[in-house]
Structures are given as C-alpha cells and as structure tokens.
A protein has these predicted regions:
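Positively charged n-region of N-terminal signal peptides that target proteins for export
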Residues: 1-3
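Bacterial N-terminal signal peptides
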Residues: 6-16
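Boundary at the C-terminal end of the N-terminal hydrophobic targeting segment
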Residues: 17-22, 26
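N-terminal accessory beta-strand-rich subdomains and adjacent acidic, glycine-rich linkers
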Residues: 25-178
C-alpha cells in the first residue's frame, strides 16, 4: 500500500507540473455550468482537465494514441465545434432502464506531424463526462490497430466518488479512502 501511495504522489506531482505550463486551447462547459473540461496543449502533447462545482476533479491527463497507420502522440489543436445535445435512451440490462441526458457535445480536431487528423468528441453533463476518439478514414484503410493508448485519468487527491452498497444506499468518499 505504501508503494502505491508513493507512485500516486509522483503521478500527482507530474500532473501538477503539466498544469503550470500548459496552454488552454478549448473549454467545454456542461449546460448547467457545473462541469468544465479544459483541453490544453504543452510541447505537442494534449491534456484534458476536469473541474466540477468549482473544484478540480481530474488533474491534467494525457490524450492520444499510436496506431499501425498513424502516430497521434504529438498533436496540434485545430478547431472545436460545440452544440447542446439532449435525448433519451433505454437499457435493457439495468436497474434504471430509461435514461435521459443533457450535455454539451464538443468535437475537437487535432493534427499530427504528418497532417493527419484525430477527432476527440466530448460529452459534458452536470455530473459526468465521456469522450471518444475518431480517426477519419483515408484511402483504402479498412481497419486500424491501436498499438498504444496514452489516455490518462489523473484524479485529484481530494476527488470524491459515490460508492453504492447492495441496498441502493451508499456514501461519498475520497478515492483514497473508499
């Protein structure tokens, strides 16, 4: 447990050092204003950071990947398109089968050294975020294999989570204390 704590402290210090020198390129705010995702660039590396209710939740965390066709580990921000997205969907294997969402959808385009685009689509809601990578199809490329994913989740030491128990009740606690 002590080694894990030391490693987590080292990661937190590295993440904090990135925050000092990174330049914010885009911000995505949830419709209710509670969640903010900042996307930053530092020495051709892309990071995202999450604040919730004015408190830092996720320290700067790396984005990027390396595939058999393209290297998206060093990127330059190109553009962002944002829109509000609302809707409902059903899940047939869940306690809550009907789900609704109200998010800010942001499509960010990045370019690598070879001029190839990587698209990262964020969905930012009041209590959640999600993102996914898109690699635009070029030529006859039928499939792409991912060799390395650089995606990180550098949680702040004081970040809280909700841990439900079997009764549906639960507790809020920091990530280190649960």
């Amino acid at each position: 447990k002590r080694i894990f704590t030391i490693i987590m402290m080292a990661v937190a210090h590295m993440c904090a050092a990135i925050a000092v020198s990174a330049e914010v390129k885009a911000s995505v705010v949830s419709p209710d204003g509670a969640t903010v995702v900042n996307v930053m660039e530092n020495e051709a590396k892309v990071y995202y950071q999450v604040d919730h209710n004015g408190k830092n939740f996720l320290n700067p965390s790396r984005l990027g990947l390396r595939t058999n066709a393209f290297d998206f580990t060093e990127l330059e921000f190109v553009s962002m398109d944002k829109e509000r997205a609302e809707g409902e969907y059903e899940m047939n294997r869940s306690k809550a089968s009907r789900m609704s969402y109200d998010v800010t959808k942001a499509v960010l385009t990045f370019r690598n050294k070879e001029g190839k685009n990587l698209i990262v689509e964020f969905h930012v809601g009041g209590n959640d975020i999600a993102f996914r990578y898109f690699i635009p199809k070029e030529g006859e490329t039928g499939s792409i294999r991912i060799f390395e994913e650089l995606t990180e989740f550098c949680f702040n030491d004081s970040a809280e989570q909700f841990r439900p128990d079997r009764t549906g009740q639960g507790k809020h606690c920091t990530l280190n204390s649960c």
